[in-house]
Amino acid sequence: MNIRPLHDRVIVERQEVESKSAGGIVLTGSAAEKSTRGVVLAVGKGRILENGTVQPLDVKVGDTVIFAESYGTKTEKIDGKEVLIMSENDIMAIVD
């Protein structure tokens, strides 16, 4: 399935985190945190400004990002993979 986000939306695949504590204990259930890092799979054309012009997004396909899961973040399954659909505003940083 092909999916194309609209406007300032971004599709991110969450990166897995290490499920062990610093002491080597394997964490499960609620003790294992979900990662707030992911790889950008697709981006919309940009944010529409009040004057009608389109401001391109800062993030690009392939960027590794750190994001905040907010009320507007949507989780979907696409081709068997769980992806997040979020606004670029929910992305806090690009990891180089």
From Swiss-Prot:
Source taxon at top rank: Bacteria
Keyword Hydrolase: no
Subcellular locations according to the entry: Cytoplasm
GO cellular component, one term: cytoplasm
Gene3D superfamilies assigned: GroES chaperonin
InterPro entries on file: Chaperonin_GroES, Chaperonin_GroES_sf, Chaprnonin_Cpn10_CS, GroES-like_sf
Keywords: Chaperone, Cytoplasm
SUPFAM superfamilies from the UniProt entry: GroES-like
GO BP of this protein: chaperone cofactor-dependent protein refolding
Membrane-spanning intervals of the chain: none
Protein task: Together with the chaperonin GroEL, plays an essential role in assisting protein folding. The GroEL-GroES system forms a nano-cage that allows encapsulation of the non-native substrate proteins and provides a physical environment optimized to promote and accelerate protein folding. GroES binds to the apical surface of the GroEL ring, thereby capping the opening of the GroEL channel.
HAMAP family: CH10
Name of the protein in its database record: Co-chaperonin GroES 1
Organism: Vibrio vulnificus (strain YJ016)
